Curated annotation (Swiss-Prot):
GO biological process terms held by the UniProt record: ATP synthesis coupled electron transport
Reported cofactor(s): [2Fe-2S] cluster; [4Fe-4S] cluster
Domain (4Fe-4S Mo/W bis-MGD-type): residue spans on this chain: 215-271
Name assigned to this protein: NADH-quinone oxidoreductase subunit G
Gene: nuoG
Cofactor note: Binds 1 [2Fe-2S] cluster per subunit.
Gene3D superfamilies xrefs: 3.10.20.740, 3.30.70.20, 3.40.50.740, Dimethylsulfoxide Reductase, domain 2
Length: 671
């Protein structure tokens, strides 16, 4: 520990800390623009100047390491004058855009100019202006406002792993640019908006829409992937205006994927706002009572074993649990969250989780990707891997896939024989596996979405056992899930094998990705919020609330249950999922024993211990899996997906459609 004096107070800080961190620990507020705790130090704004005894001039506290016996002053006339001077220089070329700037009200420059500036301006020359740069459909630029803090540049290279932003020229002519002015090739580019301390980088979809003080903030969870990123929904009235990240050090830190951040406009389009019944081949509007009575009458006329419920990728745990309870009361055990027929082993909870945990990536020294594409499936998780690789503390190899993961990676090939050789120890990469103390294996849908997924999974389990990576001090086996609902569904047993061709009635809970050609003679009930494939095929449509319009539990890929709170009201006469299921149970004269959300959650906590520990990860068991299925000769792949459109909300988002167009245009230019 290092001892130093800050404004007369003796403090101790860890070795390697900066003076800025020491001052912050001492409770002192140090103004800054370029410094960010998650980025490399630049030291170029000079706003964090403090006085150090025996130093002839103020020092940049963010870049100065602490040493024993330092005496620091943060509020002397010298410091005050230095900060006023720096602020005056920063404002020389900064435009008076505050009334029309989207950063107004949440701008670091505004706040610090008010607190640390002189209050008067001595500059009477012409201000410089800079042409705005094009960075794609998500980021709106106003580069005349840029103060050259270089946060965006460092984020792009250090966190996102893309070397596409930099500075050109020198002195007062310096400009931050994307060089070729193309769409940024990153799935987490929107975070540059958050870290920009001024209004140089703003959200293009949110431009001129609202001011901070007009918005209601609601804590929620991102549902467009399985990471469980913590988000804040900002709404005005019953409209979602924007989505921002919430800090959670164990999951997303303070970052957010572009799909979770920008796809909210999809909540406005193609919404199901009233019930429909198919009559004479056409869907016609109906009342709730008529729709529910039709559903109840049809259910009563079908044998229980011919009824199935399938949950979609955005379904909450509570909705699946109530629907499962209803089907069990009817005498049916046909229900599944596995609409894509993934080959997942569910003998133990640790067999289908990301056991290392997202934060645990910091400890790994070797990562083996098998049929996994974390860049598109879990962008924020992938950025953690990338940061470790760029710090030379993690090596990554992969089997299957030739896509760019934004970091250095060793390609082992795509032949299934590679996994067999690793399992028996004859492959040359075996040496690296043996040398690794904390080996992490990530299995993606390039494995479990295959017909021979169980056979490959069995081989991977042999590797897990051979190298003992599921032990008390380290959990190295990981399944990379790609949907928000799947872990929660598996946790409650909403996962029985089903054969669609043998069914007479299908209850689809927001399901749009099943092969509907197998359900041509099946009566389909669709409970969901968007008019997509499920609604188009339905005989009865029950309009439900989206994730922003109801409270629900989602379990992320590492097995952590979290609550997404209700931010706005459902559209039209749509109802919350559990309310629809409860009313349907009433028409069926069935008592499911749960009348409200609180009762559902109490029952969940009693029956499944994971739901008694919201926001926490419980200890999970793991057991070796073996299969006698035959391996195919097809190579393992992890093909790039249409990242921006993976569910009904993102598919109906105008912003996401623009992203797809921009990416296609960029790819054509590069080609």
């Amino acid at each position: 520990m290092i001892k130093l004096n800050v404004d007369g107070s003796e403090i101790e800080v860890s070795e390697g800390s900066t003076v800025y961190q020491a001052c912050t620990q001492a409770g002192k507020e140090i103004p800054h623009f370029c410094y960010h705790q998650r980025l490399k130090i630049a030291g170029n704004c000079r706003m964090c100047l403090v006085e150090m005894e025996k130093s002839p001039k103020p020092i940049a506290s963010c870049a100065m390491p602490v040493s024993n016996g330092m005496v620091i002053h943060t509020d002397t006339p010298m410091v005050k004058k230095a900060r006023e001077g720096v602020m005056e220089f920063l404002l020389i070329n900064h435009p008076l855009d505050c009334p029309i700037c989207d950063q107004g009200g949440e701008c670091n420059l505004q706040d610090q100019a008010f607190r640390y500036g002189k209050g008067t301006n001595r500059f009477h020359e012409n201000k410089r202006s800079i042409k705005d740069k094009y960075m794609g459909p998500l980021i709106k630029t106003a580069m005349t406002r840029c103060i050259q803090c270089t946060r965006c540049i460092r984020f792009a290279s250090d966190i996102a792993g893309i070397e596409e932003i930099g500075a050109i020229h020198r002195g007062e002519h310096i400009e931050v640019t994307s060089y070729l002015e193309q769409t940024l090739d990153s799935e987490i580019s929107g975070n540059m908006i958050d870290i920009c301390p001024v209004g140089a980088l703003n959200s293009k979809p949110y431009a001129f829409k609202a001011r901070k003080w007009e918005l209601k903030h609601t804590a929620s969870i991102g549902v467009h992937d399985a990471e469980g990123s913590n988000i804040r929904i900002d709404s005005r009235g019953d409209e979602v205006m924007r989505i921002l990240p919430r800090v959670n050090e164990e999951i997303n830190e303070e970052w957010l994927s572009d799909k979770n951040r920008f796809s909210y406009d999809g909540l406005k389009y193609q919404r199901l706002d009233r019930p429909y019944i198919r009559k004479n081949g056409k869907l016609v509007e109906a009342s709730w009572s008529e729709a529910l009575k039709t559903v109840a009458d049809k259910i009563k006329s079908v044998k229980p074993e011919k009824i199935v419920a399938i949950a979609g990728s955005l379904s909450s745990v509570e909705a699946m649990f109530m629907l499962k309870t209803l089907l069990q009361k009817l005498g049916s055990n046909n229900y599944s969250v596995n609409q894509f027929d993934y080959k997942l082993d569910t003998m133990q909870r640790g067999n289908y989780l990301f056991n290392t945990t997202i934060a645990g990536i910091e400890k790994a020294d070797l990562c083996l990707l098998i049929g996994a594409n974390p860049r598109q499936i879990a962008p924020v998780l992938n950025s953690r891997i990338g940061m470790r690789v760029r710090a030379d503390s993690l090596k990554v190899a992969r089997i299957g896939g030739g896509h760019n993961q934004t970091y250095k990676i060793q390609d082992l090939g795509s032949d299934i024989k590679i996994i067999e050789e690793l399992a028996i120890g004859t492959h040359e990469f075996t040496k690296a596996l043996k040398a690794a103390k904390y080996l992490m294996i990530i299995v993606g849908d390039g494995v479990y979405a295959r017909d021979d997924g169980y056979a490959i999974l069995s081989l991977i389990h042999k590797i897990v056992t051979e190298y003992n990576i599921m032990r008390d001090d380290w959990k190295g086996f990981n399944i990379l899930h790609n949907h928000a609902s799947i872990v929660g569904g598996l946790d409650i047993g909403f996962n029985t094998p089903i054969k669609l061709e043998e069914l007479e009635l299908a209850y689809l809970l927001g399901t749009d990705a099943i092969p509907f050609d197998k359900l041509k003679s099946t009566f389909i009930i669709y409970q969901g919020h968007h008019g997509d494939a499920g609604a188009s095929s339905a005989d009865v449509i029950l309009p439900a609330a989206a994730y922003t319009e109801q409270s629900g539990i989602y379990v992320n890929l590492e097995g952590r249950p979290q609550i997404a709170e209700k931010a706005v009201s459902p559209v039209g006469v749509a109802k919350e999922d559990i309310e629809i299921i409860k009313e349907l149970a009433g028409y069926l004269k069935i008592d499911i024993g749960m009348d409200n959300l609180q009762e559902v959650r109490v029952r969940l906590a009693k029956e499944y211990k994971v739901f008694a520990s919201i926001d926490r990860i419980i200890e999970n068991k793991f057991s070796k899996f073996s299969s006698k299925d035959k391996l195919s000769k097809e190579p393992i792949t992890a093909e790039p997906i249409n990242y921006y459109m993976t569910d009904v909300i993102s598919k109906n988002s105008v912003t996401m459609a623009k992203c797809v167009e921009a990416k296609e245009a960029r790819d054509e230019e590069v080609a």
